[in-house]
Amino acid sequence: MARRPGVPAAYGDEFSFVSPLVKYLLFFFNMLFWVISMVMVAVGVYARLMKHAEAALACLAVDPAILLIVVGVLMFLLTFCGCIGSLRENICLLQTFSLCLTIVFLLQLAAGILGFVFSDKARGKVSEIINNAIVHYRDDLDLQNLIDFGQKKFSCCGGISYRDWSQNMYFNCSEDNPSRERCSVPYSCCLPTPNQAVINTMCGQGMQALDYLEASKVIYTNGCIDKLVNWIHSNLFLLGGVALGLAIPQLVGILLSQVLVNQIKDQIKLQLYNQQHRADPWY
């Protein structure tokens, strides 16, 4: 059948505006994070199942396992839209993926700006989280390990000072506290001992009963909030690099999905054009 003059041969039935490079690059991009999300969920669920029931209900707000599961599930759903949308060339799924990714990016950007502008309120929120974590220190093994790591990493003890540990029922200094750890602090507050082969987990025994000078000979007495703030100020470039590293994959995903959506729309227009002119004897 003769082709209408002026219609490019490249726009025949075999031509496609959809670039295989863009399509499969977006697919494998989402597949990678899809697998990562499933690993995150699996690790989070495993961590929850390994805990006792009472510990599992003790401190949901700061439980790292719960956080891992929630982030993993959200990432799974988001990357599912990206994977299937790119593979099936589904505009609805691709637009959903792009919109959700844009919202996540804007929320992260807003959180960073608000944290910088309202640094005092952010500091207060961090203090609240740390104090809540201190209260539930013995209730959650993951939380306990996280606090111990933070205190050793930043050479600190408690939120404001080492006496913050009195908020914990096991370390409380009240006379009616029957705990053997009464008026103590965790071993992670203790100053490191050179060439120590075995960790002395009782090194913080009775430290809250000592004054600042006496306690400073054995444990860290400064709180972790000030140490954390100082660390952030000293590593702004590093944190900026991490933020950029998180933002780049999101921006790439948004860009690729929008490019693919536009290509699919152009392909649909081409198919409609071919259908409308198929009955034309000069087509």
Curated annotation (Swiss-Prot):
Residues annotated as glycosylated are: N172
Membrane topology summary: Multi-pass membrane protein
- Give the location in the cell: Cell membrane; Cell junction, Adherens junction; Cytoplasm
Tell me the InterPro entries matching this sequence: Tetraspanin/Peripherin, Tetraspanin_animals, Tetraspanin_EC2_sf
- Quaternary structure (record): Homodimer; disulfide-linked. Interacts (via extracellular domain) with ADAM10 (via extracellular domain). Interacts (via cytoplasmic domain) with PLEKHA7 (via WW domains); the interaction is dependent on PDZD11 being bound to PLEKHA7 and facilitates the docking of ADAM10 to zonula adherens.
The residue spans the entry assigns to the Cytoplasmic side of the membrane are as follows: 1-24, 86-96, 257-283
Q: Which residues cross the membrane?
A: 25-45, 65-85, 97-117, 236-256
What UniProt keywords are attached to this protein's entry?
A: Cell junction, Cell membrane, Cytoplasm, Disulfide bond, Glycoprotein, Membrane, Transmembrane, Transmembrane helix
- Gene for this chain: Tspan33
A Pfam match: Tetraspanin
Query: Which protein, by its recorded name, is this?
Result: Tetraspanin-33
Q: What's an example Gene Ontology biological process for this entry?
A: pore complex assembly
Family (UniProt): Belongs to the tetraspanin (TM4SF) family.
Q: List the disulfide bonds.
A: C156-C224, C157-C189, C173-C183, C190-C203
Q: What is the species listed in this Swiss-Prot or TrEMBL entry?
A: Mus musculus (Mouse)
